[in-house]
Regions:
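An N-terminal, well-structured beta->alpha segment
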Residues: 1-63, 67-68, 146-177, 384-389
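Short glycine-centered, acidic/aromatic-flanked micro-motifs in structured strand/loop junctions
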Residues: 47-49, 179-181, 251, 335, ...
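Gly/Ser/Thr-enriched, mixed-charge loops and adjacent short helices
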Residues: 13, 108-232
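Phosphate-binding and adjacent anionic-ligand microenvironments
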Residues: 236, 273-447
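N-terminal small/polar loop signature for handling phosphorylated ligands or for N-terminal nucleophile
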Residues: 32, 36, 40-107, 192-250
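General beta-strand structural signal in soluble alpha/beta enzymes
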Residues: 5-6, 46, 72-76, 97-98, ...
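Proline/glycine-rich low-complexity loops and linkers
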Residues: 126-161, 166, 252-325, 332
Length: 447
């Protein structure tokens, strides 16, 4: 992966790591590269989530873009998938989303989209990185009338809302849904989408103040949603993350429906409707073992990729598949969107609920989740890429894998967005897999 851009763009602690200077440099380099690629003055749209550092980084990005002669179109607070959708609608050459997704408020990130709405290719990202890090002297600043313009797209959120609503072929009359907006981008759109389609909405965490994004709420903290669903007698609850590109659900009993179960529900429904392309659902190596058993039992192919929605999308495009996603709630429905879209996912869940007449708990029962233990081990920069070269660690993983046999599995991997090694173990006996996970984690900590 690149030196600035990880699996999900450039990310770090805002201002001190992801600095204003770096944001301006990314704006300049991206605008220059895109102007060269398109052979015309680049038009770049910019969205952001609701965190306090978004305004500052947006200003720096805009300054960078316009200082090399490109035009910047500001969308305001919108979901990440809105940028991917609007870049095509507005005939832009690229889109930028300023967000750190599910991370806490001190973090922020910069993610780039191409003019087709897909994440910018590795080749273009590498070219942008090289211009910033290796040959900054090649950046050509403009002056006078050659400086770029700044435009404000005041209808951006509504353009996205209308698009999502148009993908729904039924109404949600009679459905009570609780929506946890994570005090982020979903606060702008979710209620309008679901109430506009007829649902009765119970709103949670929909008042962002710049500092409360993802704070004990949203898809990483669903306890409040679980309680709200039960207390308010809802049919279902939906939890989004800070930029609303992922969605988790809660059934009417308050039980979690994670991304794996959402994929199972969707793939089963799509197969029954004859719209599951190539009879395949794309998942990752972190997908619950229960999904693979469900898929096999239902004649569905589970195509497997590395962790990261960009790899899921690559496999979908390569194989001509129309559904894929991750346990975290990144669900890509390629018939409608080029990226994970939490609010779109939520509308499709309610569509299945309405069209089948089943309760959310009944839909989720199509798949049995195996107990899964995840231990995150913090590592320093000098230890990155080292764990799998330590015989004591690899021997332990092999030994515990043999003990689990077909009734479990072990996956150890480095995070693409945080300084962590993740140790994940699945199996039927929670006590055993917890013990194994912590023993492996201890070995990694000692390396």
């Amino acid at each position: 992966m690149g030196r600035l851009f990880g699996t999900d763009g450039a990310r770090g602690v805002a201002i001190t790591e992801l600095t204003c200077e770096l944001a301006m440099q990314i704006g300049r380099a991206a605008a220059m590269v895109l102007t060269k690629e398109t052979n015309h003055k680049a038009k770049i749209i910019i969205g952001k989530d609701a965190r306090i550092s978004g305004d500052i980084l947006e200003s720096a990005l805009v300054a960078g873009i316009c200082s090399v002669g490109a035009d910047a179109h500001i969308l305001g607070v919108v979901p990440t998938p809105a940028v991917a959708m609007l870049v095509k609608k507005y005939n832009a050459d690229a889109g930028v989303m300023i967000s750190a997704s599910h991370n806490s408020v001190e973090f922020n990130g910069i993610k780039l989209f191409s003019g087709t709405g897909f994440k910018l290719s590795d080749e273009i990202e590498n070219e942008i990185e090289a211009l910033i890090l290796d040959t900054p002297e090649k950046i050509e600043l403009k002056d006078g009338c050659d400086i770029g313009h700044v435009y404000y797209e005041k209808d951006a959120a509504w353009d996205y809302i209308r698009y999502v609503m148009k993908t729904v072929q039924t109404d949600f009359n009679g459905i009570r849904v609780a929506l946890d907006c994570a005090n982020g981008s979903a606060s702008v759109c979710a209620q309008r989408i679901f109430e506009g389609l007829g649902a009765k909405c119970i709103m949670l965490n929909d008042k962002p103040d710049g500092t409360n994004i993802n704070k004990d709420c949203g898809s990483t903290h669903i306890e409040g949603l679980q309680k709200a669903v039960v207390d308010n007698h809802c049919d279902i609850g939906l939890a989004f993350d800070g930029d609303a590109d992922r969605c988790l659900a809660v059934d009417e009993k308050g039980e979690l429906i994670d991304g794996d179960k959402i994929l199972a529900i969707f793939s089963k429904y799509m197969k029954s409707m004859g719209i599951l392309k190539n009879n395949t659902c794309v998942v990752t190596v972190m997908t619950n073992l229960g999904f693979f058993k469900y898929a096999k039992a239902n004649g569905i192919v589970a195509a497997t990729t590395k962790v990261g929605d960009r790899y899921v999308l690559e496999e979908m495009l390569k194989g001509g598949y129309n559904i894929g996603g991750e346990q975290s709630g990144h669900i890509i429905l390629l018939d409608y969107a080029n990226t994970g879209d939490g609010e779109l996912t939520g509308t499709k869940l309610l569509t299945v609920l309405k069209c089948t007449g089943e309760k959310a708990s009944e839909l989720a029962a199509c798949m049995e989740c195996y107990p899964q233990v995840l231990v995150n081990v913090k590592i320093t920069a000098d230890k990155k890429g080292m764990w799998d070269k330590v015989p004591e660690i690899t021997d332990a993983i092999k030994m515990y894998s043999e003990k689990l046999g077909d009734e479990g599995r072990i996956l150890v991997r480095e995070s693409g967005t945080e300084p962590l090694v993740r140790v994940m173990i699945e199996g039927k006996r929670t006590g055993i897999i917890t013990e194994y996970a912590h023993k492996i984690a201890e070995l990694i900590e000692k390396m």
